[in-house]
Structure formats: C-alpha cells, structure tokens
Amino acid sequence: MEKFGVHNPATELATVGLGGAASVRYNFSAAALYEEAIRRGEAELTAQGALRALTGQHTGRSPRDKFVVRDANTDGQIWWDNNKPLSPEHFALLRDDMLAHAAGKDLFAQDLVGGAEEGHALPTRVITELAWHSLFIRNLLIRPEAAALPTFVPKLTIIDLPSFKADPARHGCRSETVIACDLTNGLVLIGGTSYAGEMKKSVFTVLNYLLPAKGVMPMHCSANVGPDGDAAVFFGLSGTGKTTLSADPARTLIGDDEHGWSENGIFNFEGGCYAKTIRLSAEAEPEIYATTQRFGTVLENVVLNERREPDFDDGSLTENTRCAYPMHFIPNASETGRAGHPKTIIMLTADAFGVMPPIARLTPDQAMYHFLSGYTAKVAGTEKGVVEPEATFSTCFGAPFMPRHPAEYGNLLKELISRHGVECWLVNTGWTGGAYGTGKRMPIKATRGLLAAALSGKLGQLQFRTDTNFGFAVPVSVDGVDGSILDPRSTWADKAAYDAQAEKLVSMFIANFAKFEDHVDGGVRDAAPGVKAAAE
C-alpha cells in the first residue's frame, strides 16, 4: 500500500482491516484535496474558488437506513423506539464486506476531533473513498495541530464508501444504503450514499451516546456569547431560525449546530459550519454568503450557471443545498469554540397555526416540557394552494441523532438549568394574525428586538401575563415592538377561530407528550398546556 501524508504509524489503516487498499492519503490539505477531487472527476471548481460536488440520488440524510448495533452494552441504554437495532453478527458481515470492497481502492483519511473541550473530546478518524468527502469532514470537525498528528490515536473510526451497496438479506438492513453505528467498539460504516452530512451526524450521534454518562449534556443547537461573556444557546428544528438568529454582529459565534454543556460551560462539537444555501443572498446573510465565494468551501448540490457561478435560487437538484466551511471563515467566530455556562436558553419554534406568542418565559419544568416536545410546524408548498399546517414534534429538537431515551437528556438539561439559574425563553418565528395562509410571518425585526431584550436581561424585568393556553409568561409590552403581536389572539379577526385553533394545537401537544409522562416528574407533567377560557 502506498502511503502519503503525516500520520501515526501505529494506527495505520491496516489496524482496522483496510490493509488491502491500493493507497491512502492521510490528512491532506484543502489544496491537495481540491487537486485530487478535480483530477478524479468528483467535483469542479467554481468561478470564485469554492469546490462544488453533487451527491446523486441521495441529497439528504437517510434516517430509515440508520442502525445501531444492539449488544450487551447498548441493549439497556438505547431508545429502541427511535433507533433501529442491528445484530453484532450482521454488523460483522457488513464490516467484512465493506473492507473487502475497499481492497485496491485509493482512500483518504483525516484525523480530527469532535468536541472543543479537551476532557470530553472524541478523536475521530474518517476514512473516505471520495477526496471531496475528506475535505468536507476536514472543514466540519476540529482540526488538531499538525504536531499532534504523528501521535494521534482515534477513539472513533468512520468508514464511508458510497460505491458499496449493502444487501438487506445478508446485512440485516433495509436497502442498499446503510449507516451502521457500533457504539461499543467506536466504528461507523456508511455505504450506498454520497450525502456528506451522514459523516457529520454520525459523530454527533456517537457524542450524544457517550457524553450523558459523563454528566455532559449534548445539544442540537447554535450558540453565541456577548462581550461580557454572557453565553446563549438556541435550540430549534430546521427552518426555525437557529443559524440566522445566532449570527449576531454584536456577539461572538461559538457554533451553529452541535454543542455540549459540561461542568465548565458550553463547547462546540465542531470546527466548521454546514449551512443551507437555498435562496442565500449577500443582503440577508452576508457572512454565510461570503464563505461561498472563496477557496476551501465545499458547495453540495448547488447548481452552477454557464460561468460556473453558484445559483442559490435554483433548487432543481434539491431544496437541501449546502455549503461546508471551517469556522474561521466567519469573521466573528470564537477561536476556542468554548464559553461559560449559558445565561440564556432560547427554544425556537415556527408555529404555523398562528397560536403562540412571539416570546414567552419558561420555568425549568416548562423548559423541559418544551425540550422533550420539540415542536415546530411545517407548511406545504404554495404551489399546491393553502393547506393545513402540519405539526412536527422532534424530541430534544433532534430526535434522529438521540440514541438514548429523551428523558435522559431532558432531566440533565433541567438539572443544569436549575443549577446555573439559566433564563429560558420560547421564541416563535412562525405566523401571526392567523394561521399559515391567512396570517403573516412574524416580522424578523420584532423577533430580533425581543431576542436582544431577552439576552440583555431587560425583558425579564417587565410586566408579564399568563398565557391562557400554554401557561407560560408573556410580556405585556416591550419597547420598540408592536404591542399587538405579543397577544396572538388579539391579532386574529375571528376570535372563535383562534380559540378553536389553540385548542387543536394544545391537544396535539398533550397527545404527543403521553409517551414521556412515565419518565418525568410531576412538575414537568404539570407544565403541560391546557385551554382555559379566554376573555374577549
């Protein structure tokens, strides 16, 4: 086997059974990986210097093809209602077949780290058959100092071979695509998909398994910190504004997607960002847009025009177009990826039913209730006309990546909130004045104004009312914000229609939470919403 690049000779690919590969390129730089990807026809250079790659059939994650090995260690620790089991025997067959498939191939390996806090970091080796995948994961995870590479010892190994096709009958999986996680032995196998996000989320899944046992809370969130060291965490599902609202020129960005909360404070799991680019503009999101115009950034499934310039308005390949870049491409990003304990937690929702207020203060019990609920609402495409919004509940604001039972994460979060006296707010970036189709989107200016007041501590000192549907505290008036939007019912022309819509959403919350009731204490159960008669 030919070997190129700096690495630890004691942990070469042969140690994981890949000794039959034709060559391996360890820890290649962005420039070298550009050359390899372009030479192999995997990707092309854009006019501005980014690297554009297409993923073919899979333009998003394949959650139905993700499996966790069920063994003596994991059997009692994994939430099997949400995670698909794979037997150790099937995993061993899959591993052996993937290793055999890799024989004679040219491979790439990156030695990286998941987790910016040393005591909780996960040294990770990612082995890929595609050069652009090697650049992608190099951008996304934390890159160790060059001096550390000759002694680097991985605790997690990911092998990603898109050209390998799994056999459901032989490997115990669902299709030719497979993401199989052996949490006990620290090995993840990815086959049959070129979508690069699978690698990133595999590291997240493993950290979500390992950290709670150490008393560390893993979170699917963005985070930033103010000039006085006041950190804030933003939970939220896709499309609720996590990335947009945490990108604040007055605050330092810690990270946009995955963090841990330890005894020392919060820390980023990653060293880069994986931002959506559909309809991205220099006006609306200048910092993210700027990363797409430079060398080193990977553009995934972005359409290029005849001049090789990205067309971010073109969703013909997928709406899930992305860019992957290292954190230092953002001007006000943290150099350490760490901050103290959060002063504020924001839970974002985009309520398309038009029922929730733009902001509400949560008690620790209410915070745990809404964290376990993980509510937002999806809206249908306008080309099909106006249809009912669809409620989405993704527990912990990230169910696909949570191997343990949600109550484990929820109880840990509640304990940390109480211990550190964190102020919690629910922020609704959805609809006001009616449901989706009749109402309008919550003005971003109002959301930013309310958020700034919450982060500064001023909002907590104002007068509040108790919401009759959800029981949380809502400010009565806030300087610089139109007072009418603070009371959603008053923005509806038809008050009876509002009451009916509120009752409908409350009943959805209650039905969804039934599965958690046996796993939480009375305080959290009592934080459930309940419709009370509203005064006209």
From Swiss-Prot:
Binding positions for ATP per the UniProt entry: K201, H220, G236, L237, S238, G239, T240, G241, K242, T243, T244, E285, R322, T447
InterPro entries hit by this protein: PEP_carboxykinase_ATP, PEP_carboxykinase_C, PEP_carboxykinase_N, PEPCK_ATP_CS
Key word Transmembrane present: no
Cofactor: Mn(2+)
PROSITE patterns: PEPCK_ATP (PS00532)
Positions with a binding annotation for substrate: R61, Y195, K201, R322
Gene Ontology biological process: gluconeogenesis
Binding note for cofactor: Binds 1 Mn(2+) ion per subunit.
UniProt-listed Gene3D superfamilies: 3.90.228.20, Phosphoenolpyruvate Carboxykinase, domain 1 (3.40.449.10), Phosphoenolpyruvate Carboxykinase, domain 2 (2.170.8.10)
One function term, GO molecular function aspect: ATP binding
Keywords: ATP-binding, Cytoplasm, Decarboxylase, Gluconeogenesis, Lyase, Manganese, Metal-binding, Nucleotide-binding
The keyword RNA-binding is assigned to this record: no
Pathway connected to this protein: Carbohydrate biosynthesis; gluconeogenesis
Residue spans crossing the bilayer: none
CDD domains from the UniProt entry: PEPCK_ATP
EC number per UniProt: 4.1.1.49
Binding site for Mn(2+): K201, H220, D257
Recorded catalytic activity of this chain's protein: oxaloacetate + ATP = phosphoenolpyruvate + ADP + CO2
A Gene Ontology cellular-component term: cytosol
Pfam families, alphabetized: PEPCK_ATP
Chief site of localization: cytoplasm
Intracellular or extracellular location(s): Cytoplasm
The family this protein is said to belong to: Belongs to the phosphoenolpyruvate carboxykinase (ATP) family.
Function: Involved in the gluconeogenesis. Catalyzes the conversion of oxaloacetate (OAA) to phosphoenolpyruvate (PEP) through direct phosphoryl transfer between the nucleoside triphosphate and OAA.
Name the record gives this protein: Phosphoenolpyruvate carboxykinase (ATP)
